[in-house]
Amino acid sequence: GASAKEIYEECTRLTNKVEASFILDRLDYMHKGGRCSAITMMGANVLHLKPCIEVMGGKMAPTKKYRGRFRQVLLNYVEDRLAGRDDVDPYRIFITHTECDPADVQAVEELLLQHELPFAEILETDAGSTVTSHCGPNTLGILFLRK
C-alpha cells in the first residue's frame, strides 16, 4: 500500500490530466442558481440549444452550444470531444449523468464501444451533487484522462 502522502501526490498529478464536460438538456437549474438570465434560459429552451459545460481549473464554464434533440446532441458532443485526439488515455472513460433516460445513456455507451479509441473500461456513474445542483436532471457528460 501507498502512504497518504503518495496517494495525495498521485491524485494531484492526475488532477491536471482530467477532462470533464457535460451537456445540459435545459437551463432551468442554471437560471434558478443565478448562473444565467431568464431570457437566456427561455431562448435556449425554445430554440432547443444545449450548452456544453467544461470543468476547467475547478470551475464550470460554457464552451459550445449544440442544437436539436437531446440524444442526437449527446452523440455529436461525444464525437466532438474525442475526434482526432491522440492524447486521450484509452484505459477508462466515464459516462456521468443526472437522471438521464437509460436509452440516451445506452446510445452514448454504444457510440463509445464503436469508437476508434479502444476504451478498456466504460463506466456509468451518477453525477455528484455539484453537477446535479447546478445543471439539474437530464445532464450527461464524459470524463477521461489525457495521456
Label every PLM stretch briefly.
Residues 1-147:
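Mixed-charge interfacial surface used for oligomerization/domain docking
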